[in-house]
């Protein structure tokens, strides 16, 4: 097993993230202000402000492996994705986005928790064209306009290896042995999530990703 530091790509302070919304990890939007505590005006986020964007490079290798073989990649949650002291309220509102090899047509957006904060710490206050979003919608920016779409995020468990349950239902990436792949990592607060309220202010998390690789057609790590 090898470790590598995640290199931050954007210049946003990783110590202070603000609510944004996205459906594709390409276009993010924010609400610069509210009206009667409702987010009704939106603008495109410029220069990757308000969220974290980092990058690492991955290569599958192993003794006796050949370049014709393929390794399926999964997340390994044995060490937990965001450190052992992260507050659950932050996880409920956060999203982890992954883009492999620059292919933005296949973004992976993960929910880091399937729990919800107490009702007095939740709020649906995003309004688009006079309609309030429900808890399963996010904002899409296209051709200068903002619309509400279904939240594309999925549970992190769909891609995470669990020793007691075996391989997950989905594969992050099928990697050719020896080939180097880039991985762009996005960590942000989904502003349309009902859990994204003042209750998550001043909470911190350490972003650490572990991966589990299995040769295609085999069950070995």
Describe each PLM feature range.
Residues 1-25, 203-221:
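Short, polar/proline-rich extracytoplasmic segments that appear immediately after membrane translocation
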Residues 1-21, 80-160:
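A surface/secretory-pathway sequence property marking extracellular, secreted
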Residues 32-69, 74-80, 135-137, 142-221:
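C-terminal, structured domain-capping segment
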